[in-house]
């Protein structure tokens, strides 16, 4: 039973490390919000600038921000409210994709210490069972056995603590990325649906 617990702890640590590295590569700020797209959004002041923005977004089509801006740019003929609704629906989908894997880290945070505790309890039951069957108690051997058993709890905590740190960090980073993408998309939409300034009538000729 103890060996099964240790195997589960090793598997848990491998899964946790895999998702920590994978999310670290995916959630790079430059990959999600490329500076080139930020600059293009700043430069896109009028409908005539939209083709330039679309070209830049197509060059970075792996970015969630580029996909959102392309969606909004392709629907500029729609009413503003409908375009915003479509954009918000797609944004929720993109955020879910960014959060993929974080739930696994959250599960590992909860399950790793419990697996360690199970290993400790099973080991303690075995150790004290052997003591009960033995005619003489070897204190040194018992202490050594208990120390070995407690390693399961230590391993579980060593797996859970880094997972908790990275889960908290990645969760906060996704929130920050979502706010930045929302800000840039809102800025783009606001500019494209901005009412043109009223034309100033020509000055009346002065009476001679």
Predicted regions and their residues:
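Short, strongly hydrophobic alpha-helical membrane anchors
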Residues: 1, 136-138
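Predominantly long cytosolic amphipathic alpha-helical stalk/bundle segments
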Residues: 30-118, 122-136, 168-208
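Lipid-exposed faces of alpha-helical membrane segments in multi-pass integral membrane proteins
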Residues: 8-21, 108-118, 159
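Pore-lining and gate-forming transmembrane alpha-helices of multi-pass membrane transport proteins
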Residues: 6, 140-167, 171
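Short alpha-helical segments used as structural interaction elements across diverse proteins
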Residues: 20, 25, 94-97, 148, ...
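Hydrophobic/aromatic residues in alpha-helical transmembrane segments
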Residues: 13, 20, 120, 124-127, ...
């Amino acid at each position: 039973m103890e060996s099964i617990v240790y195997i589960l702890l090793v598997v848990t640590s491998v899964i946790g490390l895999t998702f920590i590295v994978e999310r670290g590569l995916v959630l790079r700020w430059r990959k999600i919000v490329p500076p080139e797209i930020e600059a293009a959004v700043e430069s896109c002041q009028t409908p005539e600038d939209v083709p330039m923005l679309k070209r830049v977004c197509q060059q970075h089509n792996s970015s969630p921000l580029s996909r959102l801006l392309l969606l909004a740019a392709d629907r500029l003929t729609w009413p503003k409210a409908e375009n915003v609704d479509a954009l918000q629906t797609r944004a929720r989908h993109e955020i879910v994709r960014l959060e993929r894997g974080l739930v696994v880290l959250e599960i590992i945070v909860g399950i790793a210490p419990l697996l360690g505790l199970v290993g400790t309890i099973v080991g303690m039951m075995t150790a004290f069972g052997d003591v009960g069957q033995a005619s003489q108690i070897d204190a040194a051997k018992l202490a050594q056995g208990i120390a070995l058993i407690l390693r399961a709890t230590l391993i579980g905590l060593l797996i859970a603590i880094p997972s908790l740190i990275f889960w908290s960090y990645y969760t906060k980073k996704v929130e920050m990325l979502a706010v930045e993408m929302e800000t840039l998309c809102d800025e783009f939409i606001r500019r494209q649906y901005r009412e043109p300034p009223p034309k100033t009538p020509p000055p009346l000729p002065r009476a001679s």
